[in-house]
UniProtKB/Swiss-Prot annotation:
Zn(2+) binds at H612, H616, E672. It is linked to Arthrogryposis, distal, 5D: An autosomal recessive form of distal arthrogryposis, a disease characterized by congenital joint contractures that mainly involve two or more distal parts of the limbs, in the absence of a primary neurological or muscle disease. DA5D is characterized by severe camptodactyly of the hands, mild camptodactyly of the toes, clubfoot and/or a calcaneovalgus deformity, extension contractures of the knee, unilateral ptosis or ptosis that is more severe on one side, a round-shaped face, arched eyebrows, a bulbous upturned nose, and micrognathia. Belongs to the peptidase M13 family. It comes from the Eukaryota. It comes from Homo sapiens (Human). Its cofactor is Zn(2+). May contribute to the degradation of peptide hormones and be involved in the inactivation of neuronal peptides. Changing G607S: In DA5D; patients have ophthalmoplegia. N-glycosylated. InterPro entries: MetalloPept_cat_dom_sf (IPR024079), Peptidase_M13 (IPR000718), Peptidase_M13_C (IPR018497), Peptidase_M13_dom_2 (IPR042089), Peptidase_M13_N (IPR008753). This is Endothelin-converting enzyme-like 1. Highly expressed in the CNS, in particular in putamen, spinal cord, medulla and subthalamic nucleus. A strong signal was also detected in uterine subepithelial cells and around renal blood vessels. Detected at lower levels in amygdala, caudate, thalamus, pancreas and skeletal muscle. Detected at very low levels in substantia nigra, cerebellum, cortex, corpus callosum and hippocampus.
Amino acid sequence: MEPPYSLTAHYDEFQEVKYVSRCGAGGARGASLPPGFPLGAARSATGARSGLPRWNRREVCLLSGLVFAAGLCAILAAMLALKYLGPVAAGGGACPEGCPERKAFARAARFLAANLDASIDPCQDFYSFACGGWLRRHAIPDDKLTYGTIAAIGEQNEERLRRLLARPGGGPGGAAQRKVRAFFRSCLDMREIERLGPRPMLEVIEDCGGWDLGGAEERPGVAARWDLNRLLYKAQGVYSAAALFSLTVSLDDRNSSRYVIRIDQDGLTLPERTLYLAQDEDSEKILAAYRVFMERVLSLLGADAVEQKAQEILQVEQQLANITVSEHDDLRRDVSSMYNKVTLGQLQKITPHLRWKWLLDQIFQEDFSEEEEVVLLATDYMQQVSQLIRSTPHRVLHNYLVWRVVVVLSEHLSPPFREALHELAQEMEGSDKPQELARVCLGQANRHFGMALGALFVHEHFSAASKAKVQQLVEDIKYILGQRLEELDWMDAETRAAARAKLQYMMVMVGYPDFLLKPDAVDKEYEFEVHEKTYFKNILNSIRFSIQLSVKKIRQEVDKSTWLLPPQALNAYYLPNKNQMVFPAGILQPTLYDPDFPQSLNYGGIGTIIGHELTHGYDDWGGQYDRSGNLLHWWTEASYSRFLRKAECIVRLYDNFTVYNQRVNGKHTLGENIADMGGLKLAYHAYQKWVREHGPEHPLPRLKYTHDQLFFIAFAQNWCIKRRSQSIYLQVLTDKHAPEHYRVLGSVSQFEEFGRAFHCPKDSPMNPAHKCSVW
């Protein structure tokens, strides 16, 4: 999901909404007369009754007809009032005090009001206006790097999951449910984990050949016995540790109906290549902390010559960092330029110092031909890796590969290893104390038993009714995008037709995959052994089984309805190579979505996230894929050129934002910024469509904002968040999202309807005269 922001408001400019409640005066006698009922005419008719005997028959008939017509008008007026002035579906209805709808409206009003800072002008700094109250009242918990409104939803989901795991039974049942509970208990059994100490890892290291080529010096005979490919097989094919490069089974970007082996740059421990280059004070500190971490872990494992090993391993990673292309680079955003499909025979010529057929045969348990095709996403990188292998001593390469396995698994060891990891995280991100054990174990259960845990979650915390309502909300927002495509003046007819087709074919997954309702189907996802006293072995069993499932895909038919994340995930995503949007049950929770909240808040909350993911299909990344999820340029050159010019405006806008003296990278964050802006507009216009169809909503109690204003406030309050200063450095360096503050400011300031809703003067910070717009 996403990140933080600020704003300002003159409250005397806000328009209060007046409404007549059917729960008000006269309610005890039944529904009160709706506004517009001709009371005066009724009294006149009644008062004239004494003169009736003197009227002739024609006059009486005429009067009767008028009375009948008046009655019809009254009935029609009542029906219209029920539709437009009475309670709407969002829940403001004719109900007694204390009914669920009223409670939900009151709860929503309290949440919004507590988060606001009414002293700030929304036309100056909307983020600070919308989130100032929240920022004042909340601190970052000691064991967290960030904390925000969405994180609070995560805490609620975590507590629910913990309670489900603590139960001896319950839920849909099945072997997978028993296994995830046993796994969770094994993770909590710190006494047993401490008793074992480093032994589980020492067994893994021995399986990889030990340190220093089994403890021998590099000399004739020993070097000849060493085989890089065998160790790569252990690292990648047994322990799932990316070393030198990554090997994955993925959809073929140019033919998404089949799976393909994909090879890409990888093998660094730190999250960004520039951290190895020590180009500023922050990266120097992080690199020094990483070196200390390496030495400490090596010492805990009883290795010899710890300082020398750490230095040599670090030098290998620094060499890899120097040949790695930054994710900020244009090359890494242009999939077509990266994509290089080659045969195994061709791959062998590109990187002659690796035995590819042998390596892939071992991992996939296949007998590949030299004509088997793989996709190489980093051709230049792999050529340089081959040179690095040739020029690096075997002993050093061996220790690097073993280290990559150690790093992947060290978080599952005894407290001294976990303390070393925490100290590194403390220097990198500023966390004050380690996460409590129960949270750590819940995270591991999510990672290794995601769907089993998800089956428990949706069984109790997400209904079929909620799923249907969100699906309708998605369809409303898709409809608006369809309309928007017809209105864009920069898109020609040919490109517009392809864009419409992509929208029509887009798959939408909401809540959970249907197979979770079938215990037998869930069990098949976890056919490996789990025991309460063998946590580390449980981890290894899970990793090996996951590798087995992955390698089997290479000959399987593609099922594009599969989910990348489990339903309890607090996230949403769009996959361009499937043309698929997914909104898990974990994010469809209050306060992002509540079926009893006003629709202004639902459209401003989850609606803007739905619009965000939908827009990803047409940003600088997703726009490279067609309606079937294939990497295909479906734009005309004229339309694409105009798209790039409009996108450049957004790049310049975000390039001008700074956080802690770090400049936001407008190009690196472009796709997310396009999605934020587009999502806000789509959700807003979808809400206007909803109002036209259902009538205006009742105002929230004790809040004087219109529902258009509440829509924008809800959007901003999605991103109320605090970050530790150290984590902001890494966020700007590595995150494709702009800091949350600017996600809000950048989006609302470029949307004409925001300025109109808050009556912002032209050229005020939130309503500049010149605006950027793509979708």
